[in-house]
Curated annotation (Swiss-Prot):
One of its GO terms (cellular component) is cytoplasm. GO terms for molecular function: peptidyl-tRNA hydrolase activity; tRNA binding. TRNA binds at Y14, Y64, N66, N112. InterPro entries: Pept_tRNA_hydro, Pept_tRNA_hydro_CS, Pept_tRNA_hydro_sf. Residues 183-223 are annotated as: Disordered. Hydrolyzes ribosome-free peptidyl-tRNAs (with 1 or more amino acids incorporated), which drop off the ribosome during protein synthesis, or as a result of ribosome stalling. Catalyzes the release of premature peptidyl moieties from peptidyl-tRNA molecules trapped in stalled 50S ribosomal subunits, and thus maintains levels of free tRNAs and 50S ribosomes. This is Peptidyl-tRNA hydrolase.
Amino acid sequence: MLLVVGLGNPGKEYAAHRHNVGFMAIDALADEVRADPFREKFSGVHARAEIAGQQAILLKPMTYMNESGRSVQPAMAFFKVAPSELIVLHDELDLPFGTVRLKVGGGHAGHNGLRSIISHGGTGNFGRVRLGVGRPPAGFRGEVADYVLSGFDAVERASLPDCLKQAVQSVLEVAARGFEAAMNVRNTRPKPGKRQKGEGDGSTDPAPAAKEGKGPLPPTQKP
């Protein structure tokens, strides 16, 4: 069984924020695979589905981002899901907007939703679908948290459906072929000299403020 988790913050006031692109992606996935209606449990809402012939649970934690692990870990225990069967969809500052990349394992790179899941589960050895939202543009007034807790601009909104479609297709590919094969298909690298920081296999060093255990906690000091 697969447990596919989309990260975000509950409430209408957060629904269109960059930080909620994981929620958006899990909703798009639910539509694509015709999942059952979402029901409340595990401090979140979950739905049953079949993806590429596998039974799956789609989960949206309703704990606010910083406490996502309080929802994910009980769901894993209840459904007897191993870390290798967990897929987390989340926003990624270190990828340009519209870029979707797969990754297995690693740390949280300053993402407080991942931080909570790793803390509660005791391991980071699970799959991630990273949806790029980019870093704040030059001249942005505010902290990184203010940026991810703000809406997409008009150009981004026009491209967002394609980004969500990429995320959905990535999950379908993982379910059908496994992470390694899916990464070979989905993590297409740019031409030499065109590589963006953070692209590829997710192994690039995060920005200084986002390194584990150093600097202020980025994206989600606010809910």
